[in-house]
Amino acid sequence: MLLLRPYEFWFVTGSQHLYGEEVLQQVEGHSRTIVNELNRDSVFPFSFVFKSVVTTPEEIRNVCLEANASEQCAGVITWMHTFSPAKMWIGGLLELRKPLLHLHTQFNRDIPWDSIDMDFMNLNQSAHGDREYGFIGARMGVARKVVVGHWEDPEVRERLAKWMRTAVAFAESRQLKVARFGDNMREVAVTEGDKVGAQIQFGWSVNGYGVGDLVQSIRDVSEQSINELLDEYAELYDMVPAGRQDGPVRESIREQARIELGLKAFLQDGNFTAFTTTFEDLHGMKQLPGLAVQRLMAEGYGFGGEGDWKTAALVRLMKVMADGKGTSFMEDYTYHFEPGNELILGAHMLEVCPTIAATRPRIEVHPLSIGGKEDPARLVFDGGEGAAVNASLIDLGHRFRLIVNEVDAVKPKHNMPKLPVARILWKPRPSLRDSAEAWILAGGAHHTCFSFAVTTEQLQDFAEIIGVECVVINEHTSVASFKNELRWNEVFWGRKQGLL
């Protein structure tokens, strides 16, 4: 996985001086115990740092300002162990710019029935302390995640861990750089968009680079580096017999290795973590990048075909949310309309990430009917099975919309021996008919990010943090209700942006 900086999450406990120093010491002790125990659990991808028990408006504001200034702090987790009058939190919450999670828990799991007294009641007040704090968040319209349950509960910890990855995706979003090689595919609408608006909203720096610059980087690759990479290919993947001996097939694979190394060097030199290509802008290149793109995606880079920079950035961020696992650029390619067994076959010309593979990928070389270049090498495989999501980010002109469809990937019942690309088969929820109708009504793109590892909840959380609309198509969706949701969202987001 493409390296991330060592992020951390600050744990801040709310209380007040009303209860005396002894109670505050107990509150701090309990808070430290929780943080220490959470840090022992490998489910968490990043560390927790206990900052303090805050008891005054000044302390609260200061810790929020410190969080804003810290490059390591990816989010703030708050918990009211006792009652903490929420007017104290106004100044701090007005300043806070980092993702916020409200953990509604308490130190003890069970009520000590035989020994409970008023001392215990005064100390363990999160049941109503967190409600007071929750009110001020609602009153101020603060975007925050609320997780409820005992801090030792595995489900609570799993939700915390996924939110941490989403918060880190937000941090990465604020510094994400996308390199565009060539422009968008000509006359295509949905891959266009407002790059300035995207940088303001998401933080993305999206810039174009001449294919000639990439070609020079490819030419600079040494033969020794190519040979070493070919050895790696032979170890990781199956390969057609002709690919293991001198000849045109071997040379095609060799060219993709050269492209991979040159492309990676260009991205590393510019600190890019996402990129696009297009088959219409390949001057000076022998092949459309195929195998090269697939392998870079597997390392954690975001990618979008035909100049689709929004999907490239989304793939990168979902890779972060997924820790690099089971996530790929995707396209709804063709339908299977068998009654009672409607399916969608997802694929692309070449560029599907092997992290979603169910079978050992095989390097093959086949003609590509568009682009006018030599036959490109690519990885061919069937995708895995299981629950997944397809996500699309579109530009509506006055705002962005994130569209999520929950799907179930299935194992193909038939071989596809003549299909020379990686592919995956899925059943969309609630059905192909209703999901496609809702998707089209929402303006969802034909390009998506497909993921086994990212959840709908994570994508909703990301949209909440970043401040964009998110609509979900799942087993509960009815088209009539979905159309109403789109209408209501138009009013809500228009008012939020001052357009109504």
Swiss-Prot record:
Annotated binding of Mn(2+), by residue: 306, 331, 348, 447
Listed cofactors: Mn(2+)
Enzymatic reactions: beta-L-arabinopyranose = L-ribulose
Its job: Catalyzes the conversion of L-arabinose to L-ribulose.
Residue ranges of the TM segments: none
Name of this protein: L-arabinose isomerase
Cited InterPro entries: Ara_Isoase_C, AraA_central, AraA_N, AraA_N_sf, Fuc/Ara_isomerase_C, Fucose_isomerase_N/cen_sf, Lara_isomerase
Annotated signal sequence range: none
Keyword vocabulary terms for this entry: Arabinose catabolism, Carbohydrate metabolism, Isomerase, Manganese, Metal-binding
BP term (GO), one: L-arabinose catabolic process to xylulose 5-phosphate
Gene Ontology CC terms: cytosol
Molecular function GO terms recorded: L-arabinose isomerase activity; manganese ion binding
Encoding gene (name): araA
Homology family: Belongs to the arabinose isomerase family.
Cofactor descriptive note: Binds 1 Mn(2+) ion per subunit.
Species in which this protein is naturally found: Anoxybacillus flavithermus (strain DSM 21510 / WK1)
Pathway(s) per entry: Carbohydrate degradation; L-arabinose degradation via L-ribulose; D-xylulose 5-phosphate from L-arabinose (bacterial route): step 1/3
NCBIfam families noted in UniProt: PRK02929.1 (NF002795)
The UniProt record lists the keyword Protease: no
EC id: 5.3.1.4
Lineage, opening ranks: Bacteria, Bacillati, Bacillota, Bacilli, Bacillales
